[in-house]
């Protein structure tokens, strides 16, 4: 399954990501690759992310972040952060992180 994304930072820089599949250990998703690249370069303010993917190079369908990535992203963005999902028929669907994860976990929930 192929996934790629582009993360737009408020600084104007764009960080790309792709999923990396492994046989023996947990794989990493494109969204987390892009965010960790950006964060490691000092970025902290994010505009939006564009995500596309599919089960072959010839077929790209709507591709939404998995639950792990939704939680991960929610810890670095505000609730209005936009996620744009691309499809193979040139359709772009816009979501906010809150649309996809309305009840994210925060460390403050433990107190």
Where does each model-flagged region fall?
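Zn2+-dependent cytidine deaminase-like catalytic core
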Residues: 16-109
């Amino acid at each position: 399954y192929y996934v790629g994304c582009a993360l737009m930072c408020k600084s104007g820089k764009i960080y790309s990501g792709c999923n990396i599949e492994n046989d023996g250990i947990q794989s990493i998703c494109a969204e987390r690759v892009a965010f960790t690249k950006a964060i490691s370069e000092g970025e902290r303010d994010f505009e939006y992310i564009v995500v596309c993917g599919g089960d072959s190079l010839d077929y790209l369908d709507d591709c939404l972040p998995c639950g792990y990535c939704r939680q991960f992203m929610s810890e670095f963005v505000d609730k209005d952060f936009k996620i744009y999902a691309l499809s193979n028929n040139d359709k772009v669907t816009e979501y906010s992180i809150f649309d996809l994860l309305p009840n994210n976990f925060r460390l403050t929930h433990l107190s």
